[in-house]
Swiss-Prot record:
EC number(s) per entry: 5.2.1.8
Function text: PPIases accelerate the folding of proteins. It catalyzes the cis-trans isomerization of proline imidic peptide bonds in oligopeptides. Involved in promoting the expression of the juvenile phase of vegetative development, and, to a lower extent, in regulating the positioning of floral buds, floral morphogenesis and the expression of HSPs. Collaboratively with RBL and ULT1, influences floral meristem (FM) determinacy in an AGAMOUS and SUPERMAN-dependent manner, thus contributing to the floral developmental homeostasis.
PROSITE patterns given in the database record: CSA_PPIASE_1, CSA_PPIASE_2, TPR, TPR_REGION
Subcellular location: Cytoplasm
Gene source species: Arabidopsis thaliana (Mouse-ear cress)
GO molecular function, one term: peptidyl-prolyl cis-trans isomerase activity
Keywords, ordered alphabetically: Chaperone, Cytoplasm, Isomerase, Repeat, Rotamase, TPR repeat
Domain of life from the UniProt record: Eukaryota
Protein name in the entry: Peptidyl-prolyl cis-trans isomerase CYP40
Length: 361
């Protein structure tokens, strides 16, 4: 029998983020690993000491320190002051054989020797100074990208995330069963959100380019359905896969041009999503990225004009739209947006003239 595996599905700010898959070292620290496994399945019922379910589901990550770790598992207080193990409030340190030798190590949080409960943390870097003080009992095998997403959530006082980072669901993965990483959102996108989570990493450049197009197309479908958040997620994912393309052999000038054009299109589509959210600054940044790889990207210029308009920078908006019209002088959408910008500029100029006249009355 192999080592036990568990999963945690994470939501950030109420939006499902992805799955973390954890391998437990039940051959080295069986008691500690079993505590975590049963807290994932929730099969032990209510805790006799706290009266709350001995279950991580619905629990949140209450402490996040960038460049160090993310911490959760306080099933009773949800703030780092509580918790309960399946053995009672606390149980002893099992051993310190395993080390905090790299990112993704799963370890018990405590308040001193022999004070293990339900709280745990996942390292985001090597943390050797914790060796001999905290019991390591597992490691993240897939979903480190989700861990990074948690790590980069903005924080408030006492390293508490400003958004709720919640264990939406959790449990055990039976031996030999699918880990649920692929097609996590059940929309037909069969590839994991993060390339590092692929079971096999193909060497062929063509595979990666086809996958980028596949994921981008899923983003476009979500955009058409007005599911802009999921569309944006797909565009970000497509960019992650596109980044891997540059590591592969066989990139000639034609392929390089095609990759840059695709990257420009993805950033343009991402900008469109952000405009729908009202994130004009984010959209503007994406259009700048888009035009680094394709300076004659008409759609990027159009989105840039829209972003400037939303930021009330009408002069910059007019400049972007004028450039777009140079490439597509008959485009009805660009002409309509440009007319609206010019109307706003005319109104502003007229108001300024009125103010000047008042000054000299």
């Amino acid at each position: 029998m192999g080592r036990s595996k568990c999963f945690m599905d994470i939501s950030i700010g109420g939006e499902l983020e992805g799955r973390i898959v954890i391998e437990l070292y039940d051959d080295v620290v069986p008691k500690t690993a079993e505590n975590f496994r049963l807290l994932c399945t929730g099969e032990k019922g209510l805790g006799p000491n706290t009266g709350v379910p001995l279950h991580y589901k619905g629990n949140r990550f209450h402490r996040v320190i960038k460049g160090f770790m993310i911490q959760g598992g306080d099933i009773s207080a949800n703030d780092g002051t509580g918790g309960e193990s399946i053995y009672g409030l606390k149980f002893d340190d099992e051993n310190f054989e395993l080390k905090h030798e790299r990112k993704g190590m799963l370890s018990m949080a405590n308040s001193g020797p022999n004070t293990n409960g339900s709280q745990f943390f996942i390292t985001t870097t090597r943390t050797s100074h914790l060796d001999g003080k905290h019991v390591v009992f597992g490691r993240v095998t897939k979903g480190m990208g989700v861990v990074r997403s948690i790590e980069h959530v903005s924080i408030e006082e006492q390293s508490c995330p400003s958004q709720d980072v919640v264990i939406h669901d959790c449990g055990e993965i039976p031996e030999g069963a699918d880990d649920g990483i692929c097609d996590f959102f059940k929309d037909g996108d069969v590839y994991p959100d993060w390339p590092i989570d692929l079971n096999e990493s193909p060497a062929e450049l063509s595979w990666w380019m086809e996958t980028v197009d596949f994921v981008k197309a899923h983003g476009n479908e979500h955009f058409k359905k007005q599911d802009y958040k999921m569309a944006l997620r797909k565009y970000r994912k497509a960019l992650r896969y596109l980044d891997i393309c540059w590591e592969k052999e066989g990139i000639d000038e034609e392929t390089s041009t095609a990759l840059r054009k695709t990257k420009s299109q993805i950033f343009t589509n991402s900008a469109a999503c952000k405009l729908k959210f009202g994130d004009a600054k984010g959209a503007l940044l994406d259009t700048e990225f888009a035009m680094r790889d394709e300076d004659n990207n008409v759609k990027a210029l159009f989105r840039q004009g829209q972003a400037y308009m939303a930021l009330n920078n009408v002069d910059a908006a007019a400049e972007s739209l004028e450039k777009a019209l140079q490439f597509e002088p008959n485009d009805a959408g660009i002409k309509k947006e440009y007319a609206a910008v010019m109307k706003k500029i005319a109104f502003r100029d007229n108001e300024e003239k009125k103010q000047y006249r008042k000054m000299f009355v």
